[in-house]
């Protein structure tokens, strides 16, 4: 929720005016992101706008800006969106620890065009199945017509009925 709120705040900043401070901070984030895990875009923009240059966050940015003239162009909004929604390294490791979130993260990371059906199959496997215990006296037709009766239980019922019929025939023939 906190990240969503921060993103909303940043988007409101970008929608009003795309100033040079915002462009400089985005450039700095793109250049220094692997080196600085604690880089905060909001703090960088505030420090730039207030001209608080000797701060520990803005000093490496000024060095990067002086070293290279690479900047984001205002005509490339996909770079701005990518910079806004790029999670930090600490957030990435936290997400990779959780197995369910890890699978969602991998799907977002590498979307393949032909894998939509596999995603639907995986979702069906994770759905909770509602089916009750079946009594021994219920008929096979009643159970076969129920919507929530699982395929596994149908197979079990058929196998149990076949084995009980075999036992009866063996018992009647005197082989048991």
UniProtKB/Swiss-Prot annotation:
Residues 1-19 form the signal peptide. The keyword Chaperone does not apply. It holds the Pfam family Opiods_neuropep. Residues 20-95, 169-176 form a propeptide. GO terms for molecular function: neuropeptide hormone activity; opioid peptide activity. It is found in: Secreted. Coiled coil: none annotated. GO terms for biological process: chemical synaptic transmission; female pregnancy; neuron-neuron synaptic transmission; neuropeptide signaling pathway; sensory perception; sensory perception of pain; signal transduction. It comes from the Eukaryota. Specific enzymatic cleavages at paired basic residues probably yield other active peptides besides nociceptin. The N-terminal domain contains 6 conserved cysteines thought to be involved in disulfide bonding and/or processing. Disulfide bonds: none annotated. One of its GO terms (cellular component) is axon terminus. Predominantly expressed in the brain and spinal cord. Also expressed and secreted by peripheral blood neutrophils following degranulation. Keywords: Cleavage on pair of basic residues, Disulfide bond, Neuropeptide, Neurotransmitter, Opioid peptide, Secreted, Signal. InterPro entries: Nociceptin, Opioid_neupept. PANTHER family: PREPRONOCICEPTIN, PROENKEPHALIN. Belongs to the opioid neuropeptide precursor family. This is Prepronociceptin. It comes from Homo sapiens. The gene is PNOC.
């Amino acid at each position: 929720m906190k990240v969503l709120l921060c993103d909303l705040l940043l988007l409101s900043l970008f929608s009003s005016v795309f100033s040079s401070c915002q462009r400089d901070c985005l450039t700095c984030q793109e250049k220094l992101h692997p080196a600085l895990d604690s880089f905060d875009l909001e703090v960088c923009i505030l420090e730039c706008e207030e001209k608080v240059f000797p701060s520990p966050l803005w000093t490496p940015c000024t060095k990067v800006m002086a070293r290279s003239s690479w900047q984001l162009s205002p005509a490339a909004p996909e770079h701005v969106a990518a910079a806004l929604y790029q999670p930090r390294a600490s957030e990435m490791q936290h997400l990779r620890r959780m197995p369910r979130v890890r699978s969602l993260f991998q799907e977002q990371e590498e979307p393949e065009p032909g894998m939509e059906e596999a995603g639907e199959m995986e979702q069906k496997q994770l759905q909770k199945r509602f089916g009750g215990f079946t009594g021994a006296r219920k008929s096979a037709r009643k159970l076969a017509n129920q919507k929530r009766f699982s395929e596994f239980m149908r197979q079990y019922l058929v196998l149990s009925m076949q084995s009980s019929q075999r036992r009866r025939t063996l018992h009647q023939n005197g082989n048991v």
